Amino acid sequence: MKNFLVIILLCLFTFKSYSQLQKANKFAKTITAQELKDHLYIYASDEFEGRNTGAEGQKKAVEYLRNFYIENEIEPGDLDDKDYFQKMKLNLRRGNEGEVDTENVIAIIKGTEIPDEYLILTSHLDHVGYGRTGSRSREAYIGEVKERIHNGADDDGSGTVAMLEIAQAFKQASKKGKGPKRSIIFLHVTGEEKGLLGSAYYADNPIYPLENTVTNLNLDMIGRIDPTRKGDKREYIYIIGSDHDSQDLHNLSEQTNLL
């Protein structure tokens, strides 16, 4: 997982020389396995009750994300209340849960040269909550474990905490005068497990012009390993659509998998 984050971080920098690559790698190395673990053990804990869209546990999750960005002095997105939350009402037809209040979380690190062009990193902040609708576990339907919490450590706690670490690394780079050329948007979307609803809401109500959005990299379930590989080669970067979006990104990911 850490290798995946490093390669994503390097891809978002623009390199004009080997020395610039070295500087980018320096900030990439601030991403540590321990910090990822610390975040994930909180974010996927029982306290957050599986982060079901609109539920109390999901509200705790968005507060955790907001507090992280505040503590790291990373600005909120261009929202009316400057509070990191893009609020919405969603009709959750899956599971007949009705209408709920929920929110995307949006933060930004502004670009140094082309601030009006945007790279968007996304992950979904929600999971399925307690083991009923949307659960693949047969145990969730049997006896006393019917209300089992589904913590969503990989789906998508892994992508969520990865974005936090990437944002922190970019903020440190910016403080040293080595920030990204284009603005980077950190968009944590809600309602993914209910049908990509938070993503659809942002697409219909974009905070930043879609025509100025250069690309979107989505981080989902990146805590897996490749069981066909052995030893220290089991970490594997798998980027869907990279050959369509950027041949350079595709080539870089393939080269990294050979290491």
Regions found by a protein language model. Give the residues of each.
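Structural recognition of the beta-strand scaffold that forms the well-ordered cores
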Residues: 39-44, 78, 86-87, 104-108, ...
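Second-shell loop/turn segments in exported
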Residues: 22-30, 46-56, 91-95, 144-156, ...
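Solvent-exposed loop/turn segments at secondary-structure junctions
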Residues: 47-50, 69, 75-76, 92-95, ...
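Bacterial Sec-dependent N-terminal signal peptides
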Residues: 1-23
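Alpha-helical metal-binding/catalytic segments enriched in His/Glu/Asp
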Residues: 105-107, 121-127, 132-194
